[in-house]
From Swiss-Prot:
Transmembrane parts of this sequence: 30-50, 98-118, 129-149, 165-185, 253-273, 303-323, 336-356
Catalytic activity line of the entry: a plastoquinone + NADH + (n+1) H(+)(in) = a plastoquinol + NAD(+) + n H(+)(out); a plastoquinone + NADPH + (n+1) H(+)(in) = a plastoquinol + NADP(+) + n H(+)(out)
InterPro entries: NADH_UbQ_OxRdtase_su1/FPO (IPR001694), NADH_UbQ_OxRdtase_su1_CS (IPR018086)
Cystine connections: none
Keyword field: Chloroplast, Membrane, NAD, NADP, Plastid, Plastoquinone, Quinone, Thylakoid, Translocase, Transmembrane, Transmembrane helix
One GO BP: aerobic respiration
Function: NDH shuttles electrons from NAD(P)H:plastoquinone, via FMN and iron-sulfur (Fe-S) centers, to quinones in the photosynthetic chain and possibly in a chloroplast respiratory chain. The immediate electron acceptor for the enzyme in this species is believed to be plastoquinone. Couples the redox reaction to proton translocation, and thus conserves the redox energy in a proton gradient.
PANTHER family xref list: NADH DEHYDROGENASE SUBUNIT 1 (PTHR11432), NADH-UBIQUINONE OXIDOREDUCTASE CHAIN 1 (PTHR11432:SF3)
HAMAP family per UniProt: NDH1_NuoH
Record PROSITE patterns: COMPLEX1_ND1_1 (PS00667), COMPLEX1_ND1_2 (PS00668)
Protein's UniProt name: NAD(P)H-quinone oxidoreductase subunit 1, chloroplastic
């Protein structure tokens, strides 16, 4: 016997309403994540095109010009080509490690974007330990590279993975000490709070002027973490064929290619956040952006303006990184390790001690 009273109908309707609310909440949670991933992917495509154009200008040659207007779709064409290629596995390699390595590298870098504020309202997760979460997550990527090198059953790949791990350890410590100095100055480890602490005096309030030594060390260490020339020892073509990427093809090789540019973009964004005031207009004593928050249209205009300012500062450092790659020669492995352990580490530690002393004296 089925009882169908008004009370039972109300309970069923309420249950369906709760289920719809849960589905709506899940969809609403996924929308910003997917938007962030799509935006980052478009940004990487633009960076690849810019690098090809800038390198062509430096080398006095013609860059990509056939795939789309001015060759702007060349990176998309390369990605499509890699997607359609056969995915080969080494005959005597470790298949699980060989397959997990690229995924671990790209996912760890993607997670770093969750704590990056592109504007005051465009941040996926404003955490109290945002900058240190970025350091912790990004340090997982070299483990994926080491797994890829070991799983390839190739001496060149394994040497490339070992170099990636050694390089990451050498430059992660100075980079962390520089971030710790910024946290002491800002009295917070939140990326949003660090930007707000630089907003009072315009560009004179940037941490660049208060931490010039830390800025240089952070810039060098971030380039080394991205494995860009002159720090691309893990994939040196003349020595290791292609390093840990030697045995890869198809979409897995594309993962490494994407990871490199994801890492480059996130490093440039953190230079902007930690040292250049993030989304702030940087005009001393003048902040007219809050005036646009009279209505929703004004709020959208302010968010768009802050996003543009953040990306403009970021792409300035991307230009420096790209120019550095095509103008400086590669270091030897001993020179790279000596630079990290004998120079950057002591200087960054001294910078942290000076910052701590100045903060204690100002109390």
């Amino acid at each position: 016997m089925i009882i169908d009273t008004p009370e039972v109908q109300d309970i069923n309707s309420f249950s369906r309403f709760e289920s719809l609310q849960e589905i709506y909440g899940i969809v609403w949670m996924l929308v910003p994540i997917l938007t962030l991933v799509v935006g980052i992917t478009i940004g990487v495509l633009v960076i690849v095109w810019l690098e090809r154009e800038i390198s062509a200008g430096i080398q006095q040659r013609i860059g990509p010009e056939y795939a789309g207007p001015f060759g702007i779709l060349q990176a998309l064409a390369d990605g499509t080509k890699l997607l359609l290629k056969e995915n080969l596995l080494p005959s005597r390699g470790d298949s699980p490690l060989f397959s997990i390595g690229p995924s671990m590298a790209v996912i760890s870098i993607l997670l770093s974007y969750s704590v990056i504020p592109f504007s005051y309202r465009l941040v996926l997760a404003d955490l109290n330990v945002g900058v240190f979460l970025w350091i912790a997550i990004s340090s997982i990527a070299p483990i994926g590279l080491l797994m890829s090198g070991y799983g390839s059953n190739n001496k060149y790949s394994f040497l490339g993975g070992l170099r990636a791990a050694a390089q990451s350890i050498s430059y992660e410590i100075p980079l962390t000490l520089c971030v710790l100095s910024i946290s002491l100055l800002s009295n917070s480890s939140s990326t949003v709070d660090i930007i707000e602490a630089q907003s009072k005096y315009g560009f004179w309030g940037w941490n660049l002027w208060r931490q010039p030594i830390g800025f240089l060390i952070f810039l060098i260490s971030s380039l080394a973490e991205c494995e860009r020339l002159p720090f691309d020892l893990p994939e040196a073509e003349e020595e290791l064929v292609a390093g840990y990427q030697t045995e890869y093809s198809g979409i897995k090789f594309a993962f490494f290619y994407i990871t490199s540019y994801f890492n480059l973009l996130v490093s440039s964004l953190f230079v902007t956040i930690l040292y250049l005031g993030g989304w702030n207009m940087s005009i001393p004593y003048i902040d007219f952006l809050p005036l646009f928050e009279i209505n929703n249209v004004g709020g959208i205009f302010r968010t768009t303006t802050e996003l543009f300012i953040t990306l403009a500062k970021t792409f300035f450092f991307l230009f420096i990184s790209i120019t550095t790659r095509w103008t400086l020669p590669r270091l030897r492995m001993d020179q790279l390790l000596n630079l990290g352990w004998k120079f950057l580490l002591p200087i960054s530690l001294g910078n942290l001690l000076l910052t701590t002393s100045s903060q204690l004296l100002s109390l």
